[in-house]
Amino acid sequence: MQMKSIFFSPLLILIYFAISSCSAPRSILTSGKVLPKGQVRFGINNTINVSSASIEQSIKGSRNLAESVLKNDTIIYSQQLAKLNSVFMAYCLDPISYNTEFYFRYGLGHRFDIGYRNTGGANAFDVMYQFMGSNKNSNESDQDGFYGSIGVQYSWQNYRFVNFSKFDIVQKLFGWDMNRKDITIPLVFSKSFGPEERYGGVSFGVVYSHSFINYKISPKNIYAEKIMDQVPAELLLPVSGKSGFDAYGAFINVKVGKKYVFFNFSLAAYYQNYGKYKMLGGSEVLLKGISIVPSYGMQFNIFSKTKKKPVDGK
């Protein structure tokens, strides 16, 4: 059996994607204190997503490829395609990635704020509600203390391999198409540094998310036309499916600065059982693992025009 002239090591793909891919927004940058009415916050963040599932499938695929080279005069391409298929699926569900993220938040009042963020090719909107602590800014109050909030984020992305040389050809050969939507619910607590987070604060909490996955694989372009009649029928059948999975996580973040400008550092960890997915040739792959998401960046505040209220009528 022949393939079109293209060859990829799963581990090589993993290394390249580590510096060129995008993933759903998973870093937690908010504190337990939502923005007071009229306040604006925006910033830039650098996020790394390290997935054990992508690493595991890439190592397995590369090891099996090496064993085929050592034990056989020729490589059984149908087996290698199945392994490569598993690597792509693991990568799409939870990629190894480094991304620059831009975000914007606005205080609505009544202890609510809203936000938008863009992480590579993924977009997200969220709303947060503060249920504990003061909701004034440092221009209005000298109060210190603990804060608590809960929110919901909706994100979406259409998956596409990077448009780079032969790596872009992979998607065309496999006829790969995937889109993903996520609903994330963070519960956040924080302790202020100074009154009303004037100098920053430390935040921590837990996260739950549910992902909705749609995917399709149309493999006919993988094989040369002259040998199509030699390819087992099951390897030519298109594969499609819908799935969903839950993720459970915890996080901590710290921001330090003064009033208008802050540096922030965050670390989140997630566990997820992605479930089973149909692969080429009728096989299935079961994926699960953990993800570590460190991030760092800067944020800027613009306060509404308010004055600190006088104390005791003075």
Language-model-detected regions and their locations in the chain:
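Outer-membrane beta-barrel transmembrane domain signature
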Residues: 45-84, 164-293, 298-313
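Short loop/turn motifs that connect adjacent beta-strands in outer-membrane beta-barrel proteins
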Residues: 33-38, 111, 132-148, 192-202, ...
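Bacterial N-terminal signal peptides that target proteins for export
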Residues: 1-10
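Transmembrane beta-strand segments of Gram-negative outer membrane beta-barrel proteins
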Residues: 34-52, 148-154
